[in-house]
Every structure is written in C-alpha cells, then in structure tokens.
Amino acid sequence: MKFIYTTLIALLLGSIAPHVLAAEEVTLFDRYGFAVAYIDSGNLTIYLWNGEPVAYLQRENETRFNAFGYNGKHLGWYLNGVIYGHDGDAVCAIAERLNSTHETDPRSRRQFVRIKTATGPVPPLPVFFNTFSAAPCDDVLGEGASR
C-alpha cells in the first residue's frame, strides 16, 4: 500500500512540476532571438544566462516595472514582456514578442542574489518603440552588476 501511495505521489508531482517551473522563470531573448537572461518571477530577479544575478524588477504600476541593477542603477522598464532602455528601444524580450527564437542552451547554475543597494532616480519615461536597441541585452543588464 505504501508503494502504491508513493508511486501515485511521484506521478502526480512529475506531471505538475514542469508547469510550476515553467511559470516561475521567464526567458529573455536578445534582438537576434538568443536566450541571454531570465526573470525569476518569485523574487523578480533578473539573471544572465550564466547564472549571475544582475538586476531586479520593482513594480511601478499595474502594467509596468522598473528594472534596477543590484548596484542601484536604473536600467530600464519592463512592460508587456519587453525590457526597454532609456532611449525607448527594446533591449530584450520574451519569445512571444519576437518573430523567431533559437534553441536555448542549458542555463548555468544560479549564483547567490546580491544585497540591493539604494536605487538611483528613475529617468523620465521615454516613448517606447517597436525597434531593438543597438546595445546588447546582456551588456545593458550587466551594467546592474558593476559597483
């Protein structure tokens, strides 16, 4: 009886776990459709694909978040699945916002989340465009890691 109960629990967890994990992480792609970062939706931390935590999201209103680096620097805004830079161009986006994406490599193991420093001022909101910035996504997000 214990074996049957254990087997049922294992099957149930096995069928639920992939959906839970998928809902907890949101992959961000660069302008070329390569996965370069992801958001842990549990604590709103943005990790580079190598596992380095570089930024986090802070809710501004119902639909928009500010992206701050762990060094306190404002990096941009997250809105409708896109991270926009200060010039209003997209820096990275979720797959559903792109025409196509490339197959993703396995991510590296997550590093420990850093201590947040005091945030700097939020710049004026730009006009958001449907074009990608020339600045690479991982470079822009990586600016949040520097001290």
Tell where the protein language model's regions lie, with residue ranges.
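N-terminal, post-signal-peptide region of Sec/Tat-exported proteins
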Residues: 40-76
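Long terminal segments
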Residues: 4-6, 11, 18-35, 42, ...
